[in-house]
């Protein structure tokens, strides 16, 4: 039984950790592409900024869903 609990804790840690790493990589790629696009066509910067913030919310939601699933694994199952 202790082995199962230990593996559950490792699974929760990996789920939260990989979710955070994926979110960080996503934000980095998105920010870099946004800056490249604004440097090429500065007149499109306001519309690109709105789209970037919408995508930032969606990318961040992936990490929050991962944390929610991890909490269910930790406290319910």
From Swiss-Prot:
It is a multi-pass membrane protein. Keywords: ATP synthesis, Cell inner membrane, Cell membrane, CF(0), Hydrogen ion transport, Ion transport, Lipid-binding, Membrane, Transmembrane, Transmembrane helix, Transport. InterPro entries: ATP_synth_csu_bac/chlpt, ATP_synth_F0_csu, ATP_synth_F0_csu_DDCD_BS, ATP_synth_F0_csu_sf, ATPase_proteolipid_c-like_dom, F/V-ATP_Csub_sf. GO terms for cellular component: plasma membrane; proton-transporting ATP synthase complex; proton-transporting two-sector ATPase complex, proton-transporting domain. It is found in: Cell inner membrane. Its main location: membrane. GO terms for molecular function: lipid binding; proton-transporting ATP synthase activity, rotational mechanism. The record marks 60 as: Reversibly protonated during proton transport. Belongs to the ATPase C chain family. F-type ATPases have 2 components, F(1) - the catalytic core - and F(0) - the membrane proton channel. F(1) has five subunits: alpha(3), beta(3), gamma(1), delta(1), epsilon(1). F(0) has three main subunits: a(1), b(2) and c(10-14). The alpha and beta chains form an alternating ring which encloses part of the gamma chain. F(1) is attached to F(0) by a central stalk formed by the gamma and epsilon chains, while a peripheral stalk is formed by the delta and b chains. HAMAP family: ATP_synth_c_bact (MF_01396). F(1)F(0) ATP synthase produces ATP from ADP in the presence of a proton or sodium gradient. F-type ATPases consist of two structural domains, F(1) containing the extramembraneous catalytic core and F(0) containing the membrane proton channel, linked together by a central stalk and a peripheral stalk. During catalysis, ATP synthesis in the catalytic domain of F(1) is coupled via a rotary mechanism of the central stalk subunits to proton translocation. This is ATP synthase subunit c. It comes from Pseudoalteromonas translucida (strain TAC 125). The gene is atpE.
